[in-house]
Design a protein with these regions (language model features):
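Conserved, well-ordered alpha-helix/loop/beta-strand core segments that scaffold catalytic motifs
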Residues: 1, 55-98
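Small/polar-residue-rich segments within soluble enzyme cores
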Residues: 1-67, 381, 398
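C-terminal, active-site-flanking charged/polar segments
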Residues: 373, 378, 386-387, 393-417
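Acidic/histidine-enriched alpha-helical segments
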Residues: 5, 95-107, 168-171, 233-237, ...
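Solvent-exposed, polar/charged alpha-helical surfaces in well-ordered, non-transmembrane soluble domains
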Residues: 11, 15-19, 29, 33, ...
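Flexible, solvent-exposed loop/hinge segments and secondary-structure transition points
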Residues: 14, 25, 78, 85-107, ...
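Beta-lactam-recognizing serine transpeptidase/beta-lactamase-like catalytic domain environment
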Residues: 50-61, 74, 105-145, 150-383
């Protein structure tokens, strides 16, 4: 007897978002767990009446309720780029773990949510607990300097400072309630804008002192810190923000520079989304819609929108954060063809043995957006315990750049500065018609993806829509569970291994590199021993 079995055609892609199911098909993590009842539906039932001899004489059949299709905001290509860049950074730096999130600041849609290490939901048993952990929303960290935007925003919003004002950074040292705090460089007098660009602790603390404890706490919570974002995934933490009543006299000196607080990467991405979206924070979310078995939409999200700061203050912060990439600590986040703004963070971790800040373990981060005047995306990159270089500007900022330079042209975002790389020029000058044609070709390559579930299965798709309204399948159910995975972007070796595991024959075409196209398309049903045709070449 063949039993329905969950299969994930894209392997580990977006695994921490999708989650996985148990042997009985019940969702145990991720979207699978949260929407298990909607996805699974209800099986049909047959009631049989028998006589005293056990012979059936009447039966009543109750039809099953087909499951619904959950459509995600995740963009397959953007997710792939984020995972690739993050994994490369983790391997090169020897880091313990990391996360990268790509967010649309205007809609709150999460376009990519990547974690490293990760796992293949088709083989959950081989994954370590650390790989199954969704670091983007379950682990908290002290944000360090990325948190300084709260003090700067509050001071400007309250009229206590302007970007052009000057502030004495006291040659890199300030005392708060007998605690001495230093800058990484002995700065003298700087403008407020330059103080943020150079990430002066002294300036941030002075602005925090101007604002005061209660107002500082108010703006921390306005930006969404201390509360769950409400994203549709299990296990999200609210972070750690102590009420003002529990602050010490020296706490403002710590909080203003991102110490004594614990946040998640998703919270930080949403906070910068408010700066990118003219001061309005839109709650991040992963569900675009839920569709009934008949194809109609049964649910569309209405994310919370909340004004955090004025449009004028947000505009001022965007300009100041652009200075961070141009003249400050995030020069490695500068983009080819696009303006960028953001903030670096380098936070010391607490040593559990001494309960003091470690001198060898750090969390490096960068969160920013591009283009500056009309941001299309917010991207946050957080690297836990990198080896060697550990500053956010050296470790995380280059990952932001790699992701942004790949996805912005693909999204059709119009460049707002000069290009240096001719390959990026060619990609960015595509007309809307050319972009549409490219996506149509991608859609045709995937036309074999199953559009409806077989009647004997009550486990439908977890999917995402592309910009043309097409559907990318992330998880499917089938009576024999042999479906074609998406091989695009994989090496010859990985493709050969996948085909061997499926019991299929591989016919490779081209001269090495990465898989560019395949026949059959992702999600198509396969016959045992079927020939798989894969075209290889260099990725643009």
């Amino acid at each position: 007897k063949k039993e329905p079995k969950r299969f994930y055609p894209n392997g580990s892609l977006a695994a921490n978002v999708l989650g996985f199911v148990g042997l009985d098909g019940t969702g145990l993590a991720g979207i699978e767990q949260v929407y298990n009842e909607k996805i699974t539906g209800e099986p049909g039932k047959v009631f049989i009446e028998k006589d005293s001899r056990g012979r059936a004489y009447e039966s009543t059949e109750v039809a099953g309720r087909p499951g619904q299709t959950v459509v995600l905001t995740i963009d397959q290509s953007i997710q792939y780029q984020a995972e690739t860049a993050l994994t490369m950074a983790i391997e090169q730096s020897g880091a313990k773990a990391g996360t990268a999130i790509v967010l649309d600041p205007h809609t709150g849609e999460i376009l990519a949510l990547a974690n490293a290490p990760t796992f293949d939901p088709n083989d959950v048993g081989a994954a370590s607990p650390a790989a199954r952990n969704n670091w983007a929303l379950q682990n908290i960290y002290e944000p360090g300097s990325t948190f300084k935007v709260v003090a700067f925003s509050a001071a400007i919003e309250k009229g206590l400072a302007k970007p052009s004002d000057t502030i004495d950074c006291q040659m890199g040292s300030i005392t708060v309630a007998k605690r001495v705090i230093h800058d990484h460089h002995p700065f003298g007098t700087l403008t407020i804008a330059d103080a943020l660009a150079k990430s002066s602790n002294v300036a941030a603390i002075k602005l925090g002192l101007r604002v005061g404890d209660p107002t500082m706490y108010e703006y921390i919570t306005r930006f969404g810190f201390g509360s769950r974002t409400g994203v549709e995934l299990p296990g999200e933490t609210a972070g750690v923000i102590r009420p003002v009543s529990r602050w010490q006299p020296s706490s403002i000196g710590s909080v203003a520079i991102g110490q004594e607080v614990g946040v998640t990467p998703l919270q930080m991405a949403a906070a910068f989304g408010a700066l990118a979206n003219d001061g309005v924070r839109v709650a991040p979310h992963l569900i675009r819609e839920i569709r009934s078995a008949g194809g109609g939409s049964s649910y569309r999200p209405n994310p919370e929108q909340r004004r955090v700061i004025s449009k004028q203050t947000a505009s001022a912060l965007r300009g100041m954060l652009e200075g961070v990439t141009l003249n400050g600590t995030a020069k490695k986040a500068q983009l080819d063809g696009y303006t960028a703004a953001g903030k670096t963070g380098t936070a010391q971790k607490i040593d559990p043995k001494t309960r003091t800040y470690s001198k060898t373990k750090f969390v490096a981060s960068f969160v920013g957006f591009a283009p500056v005047n009309d941001p299309a995306v917010v991207i946050i990159v957080v690297i836990d315990e990198p080896g060697g270089a550990y500053h956010g500007g050296d470790v995380a900022a280059p990952v932001f750049r790699q992701i942004a330079e790949q996805i912005l042209p693909e999204m059709g975002v119009i460049p707002d500065t000069d290009f240096k790389n001719p390959e990026l020029v060619a990609r960015a000058v595509q007309t809307p018609a050319e972009i549409s044609k490219m996506r149509d070709e991608e859609k045709r390559r995937d036309e074999d993806v199953r559009e409806q579930e077989s009647r004997d299965s009550t486990m439908p798709r977890v999917a995402a829509r592309d910009n043309k309204g097409g559907e990318i399948v992330y998880a499917v159910a089938t009576s024999n569970a042999i479906l074609m995975p998406d091989l695009r972007g994989r090496s010859v070796r990985d493709v050969a291994r996948a085909c061997a595991q499926l019991g299929m024959q591989l016919e490779a075409r081209g001269e090495g590199g990465r898989a560019l196209g395949q026949t059959p398309g992702a999600g198509a049903e396969l016959r045992q021993g079927e020939i798989i045709y894969v075209d290889f070449g260099k990725l643009n």
